[in-house]
Amino acid sequence: MSENRIRIATRKSPLAMWQAEFVKAELERIHPGIVVELLPMSTKGDVILDTPLAKVGGKGLFVKELEVAMLEDQADIAVHSMKDVPVDFPEGLGLEVICEREDPRDAFVSNIYKSISELPLGATVGTSSLRRQCQLRASRPDLIIKDLRGNVGTRLAKLDNGEYDAIILAAAGLIRLKLSERIASFISAEESLPANGQGAVGIECRTNDERVKALLAPLEHLETRYRVIAERAMNTRLEGGCQVPIGAFAEIDGDEMTLRGLVGNPDGSEIIEGVITGPKTEATQLGVALAEELLSKGAKSILDAVYAKA
């Protein structure tokens, strides 16, 4: 492999392509003269669009094909939305860089209403996320929640066609695709705790590829890494995939980190919450400790029931 060339495996969706183009531009800015190629490909999660994600099953629905490309030396790196990245990596691959986080909140999108509280009784809301569903149902049990799949453009088109009164999307994706004007309101973390890693972009590569690791190093954002590592550690201890009713959100103030976590029954009947504060340098330990607290409050029975239905 030329010292001056790097190949990026990416999903084909507009948001995934934005993320890959962002990393490409950063590499070109930091390393003038470098040649960066994009290798768009489809993943299982992109192909199976007629089934709720929780029922498709498995971890890594949106990353496996990209990982195979790296292991077979067809690509050097893969760029991921961190909330799609499984907790375990195939032997020989690892998460090398976590880039600076975009807004991690959920966004309320509607052509008629300004916020969840404005929705009339029995309104129809679209979201494919069990995490969002359980929090919505807990606060508004009257709402009709329908599954919503496809890329951002497809989801917005379904809203515009009148299939839903409102939909819930990650704010980061809309901001990155220059669709901020579609956001009727941002949903606070208190109202809808985000998914672990939401809004962050991660870069995976071969663990023994020192050339690529050196090229990627300047893209690392340490504060984002601390936050995402804590959130992922909690998720790992809970044995959660990317399609489970788990929320995790870390914030940093100076050297202190506050991590909030949530496990909920998708029907909204029970939500178990916890919060922990400690040194940001102990991100992994904080995540594990919070998971243990949630498990001690009964989170395992909720998650076991979800996995049994999937």
Curated annotation (Swiss-Prot):
Gene3D superfamilies: Periplasmic binding protein-like II, Porphobilinogen deaminase, C-terminal domain. Its cofactor is dipyrromethane. Its EC number is 2.5.1.61. It catalyses: 4 porphobilinogen + H2O = hydroxymethylbilane + 4 NH4(+). The keyword Cell membrane does not apply. Keywords: Porphyrin biosynthesis, Transferase. It comes from the Bacteria. GO terms for biological process: heme biosynthetic process; protoporphyrinogen IX biosynthetic process. Pfam families: Porphobil_deam, Porphobil_deamC. The modification S-(dipyrrolylmethanemethyl)cysteine is found at residue 242. Binds 1 dipyrromethane group covalently. GO terms for molecular function: hydroxymethylbilane synthase activity. One of its GO terms (cellular component) is cytoplasm. It is an enzyme of class 2 (transferase). Pathway: Porphyrin-containing compound metabolism; protoporphyrin-IX biosynthesis; coproporphyrinogen-III from 5-aminolevulinate: step 2/4. Tetrapolymerization of the monopyrrole PBG into the hydroxymethylbilane pre-uroporphyrinogen in several discrete steps. Belongs to the HMBS family. Monomer. The porphobilinogen subunits are added to the dipyrromethane group. This is Porphobilinogen deaminase. It comes from Shewanella oneidensis (strain ATCC 700550 / JCM 31522 / CIP 106686 / LMG 19005 / NCIMB 14063 / MR-1). The gene is hemC.
